[in-house]
C-alpha cells in the first residue's frame, strides 16, 4: 500500500473509532453522548433511528420542543449542550412509534465529570465509592454519598477480572436512612449489596473485583469505578458477648469476648487479632492499648470507665472493626 493511502486509511479508522466511542447505548433506548465540554467544542453529530417497519409520514419531536424537528425514519441532530439532550420521539398520525433518550457525559480538560457523587477524602486518591466485606464469603457492601435529592438514578454492575469476567451479582440500590454530614453539609447515603457467585473463602485472589456505578442526574450521566480484592476491604463486625470477671486482690479484671457471628469459619484458619483499651469518663481515651490473639485479656478497669475491644484479620492488615464496649461499673 502506498504510504499516503496508509495514512488516509489510518485517519479514516480513527474517525470511525471516534464516532463509535462518542455515543453508546446504556440500556434499551437510552444513549450516552460523550462530549468535550468547552465553549469552542463542535459537539457531536447524532443520528437517531425510528424503530418501526413504517417508512412514510414519520415525524420527530423532542421533550424540549413541541415543534416538528424533522421527518423520515432517521433524525440527525447536533448535540453540544444539555438543551440538545433529552427524549426524542418519532410519530405517525399521532401514534408514538419509538422513543430515544439522550444523556450527556461531560469531559473537561480530558477528565470525566464527577459532579453527582461526593468525594470521600480518606486517602491520597480520589474515592467516590467505598466497599466493605464482613468476611471472606464473597459478599460485600458498597456505598456512596450525594447532595442531590431529586431526578437521580443509579445502577450497579460488578465482575471479577476483565478478559474472563466471573459472576458477581448486585442487588437493588437503596437509600439509607443514615444522613452523613461533611463540611457542614448533609449528604444522602446510597448502598448496594453484592455477592460473588463462585467465591471460595480460602482461595488466594489473583484478579480484582470491579464495581461500576452508573449515575444519572436529569440528563447528566457519570460513572464511578472501584477495583479491589476482598482481602483489602475486610472489616469484621465488632466482637460479641463482652464480659468482665473481677480478679481477687487486684485492680485488674479479666475481660472476655467472642468472635463476631458473621466472621468466616473455622476460626482456627480465619483467625482474628484483638485490641483492648480502657476508656475513661466523657469518652476520654487512654493511650495504652493491649493487643492479643486470644479472646480474653487482663486490664485495669476504673469505676465509671469502660473497656472496649475491636478486631482485625490476624494475617492481613485490613480494617479494624468498630469498637464493642462493656461498662466497668
UniProtKB/Swiss-Prot annotation:
It is found in: Secreted. Keywords: Cytokine, Disulfide bond, Glycoprotein, Immunoglobulin domain, Secreted, Signal. GO terms for molecular function: cytokine activity; cytokine receptor activity; interleukin-12 alpha subunit binding; interleukin-12 receptor binding. Residues 29-106 form the Ig-like C2-type domain. Disulfide bonds join 50-90. Transmembrane segments: none annotated. PANTHER family: INTERLEUKIN-12 SUBUNIT BETA (PTHR48485:SF4), INTERLEUKIN-12 SUBUNIT BETA-RELATED (PTHR48485). Cytokine that can act as a growth factor for activated T and NK cells, enhance the lytic activity of NK/lymphokine-activated killer cells, and stimulate the production of IFN-gamma by resting PBMC. Associates with IL23A to form the IL-23 interleukin, a heterodimeric cytokine which functions in innate and adaptive immunity. IL-23 may constitute with IL-17 an acute response to infection in peripheral tissues. IL-23 binds to a heterodimeric receptor complex composed of IL12RB1 and IL23R, activates the Jak-Stat signaling cascade, stimulates memory rather than naive T-cells and promotes production of pro-inflammatory cytokines. IL-23 induces autoimmune inflammation and thus may be responsible for autoimmune inflammatory diseases and may be important for tumorigenesis. This is Interleukin-12 subunit beta. The gene is IL12B.
Amino acid at each position: 500500500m502506498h504510504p499516503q493511502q496508509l495514512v488516509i486509511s489510518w485517519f479514516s479508522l480513527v474517525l470511525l473509532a471516534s464516532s463509535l466511542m462518542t455515543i453508546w447505548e446504556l440500556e434499551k433506548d437510552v444513549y450516552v453522548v460523550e462530549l468535550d465540554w468547552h465553549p469552542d467544542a463542535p459537539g457531536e453529530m447524532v443520528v437517531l433511528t425510528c424503530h418501526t417497519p413504517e417508512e412514510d409520514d414519520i415525524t420527530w419531536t423532542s421533550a424540549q420542543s413541541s415543534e416538528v424537528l424533522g421527518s423520515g425514519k432517521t433524525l440527525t441532530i447536533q448535540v453540544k449542550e444539555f438543551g440538545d439532550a433529552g427524549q426524542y420521539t418519532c410519530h405517525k398520525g399521532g401514534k408514538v412509534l419509538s422513543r430515544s433518550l439522550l444523556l450527556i457525559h461531560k469531559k473537561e480538560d480530558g477528565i470525566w465529570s464527577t459532579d453527582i457523587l461526593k468525594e470521600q477524602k480518606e486517602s491520597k486518591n480520589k474515592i467516590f465509592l467505598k466497599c466493605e466485606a464482613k468476611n471472606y464469603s464473597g459478599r460485600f457492601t458498597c456505598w456512596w454519598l450525594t447532595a442531590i435529592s431529586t431526578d437521580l438514578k443509579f445502577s450497579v454492575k460488578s465482575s471479577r477480572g476483565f478478559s474472563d469476567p466471573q459472576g458477581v451479582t448486585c442487588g437493588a440500590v437503596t437509600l439509607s436512612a443514615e444522613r452523613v454530614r461533611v463540611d457542614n453539609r448533609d449528604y444522602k447515603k446510597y448502598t448496594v449489596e453484592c455477592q460473588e457467585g463462585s467465591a471460595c473463602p480460602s482461595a488466594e485472589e489473583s484478579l480484582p473485583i470491579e464495581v461500576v456505578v452508573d449515575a444519572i442526574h436529569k440528563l447528566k450521566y457519570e460513572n464511578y469505578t472501584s477495583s479491589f480484592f476482598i482481602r483489602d476491604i475486610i472489616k469484621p463486625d465488632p466482637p460479641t458477648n463482652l464480659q468482665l470477671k473481677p480478679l481477687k486482690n487486684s485492680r485488674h479484671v479479666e475481660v472476655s469476648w467472642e468472635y463476631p457471628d458473621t466472621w468466616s469459619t473455622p476460626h482456627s484458619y480465619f483467625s482474628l487479632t484483638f485490641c483492648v483499651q480502657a476508656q475513661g469518663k466523657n469518652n476520654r481515651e487512654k493511650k495504652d492499648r493491649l493487643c492479643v490473639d486470644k479472646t480474653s485479656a487482663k486490664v485495669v478497669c476504673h469505676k465509671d470507665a469502660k473497656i472496649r475491644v475491636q478486631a482485625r484479620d490476624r494475617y492481613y492488615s485490613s480494617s479494624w472493626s468498630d469498637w464493642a464496649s462493656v461498662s466497668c461499673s
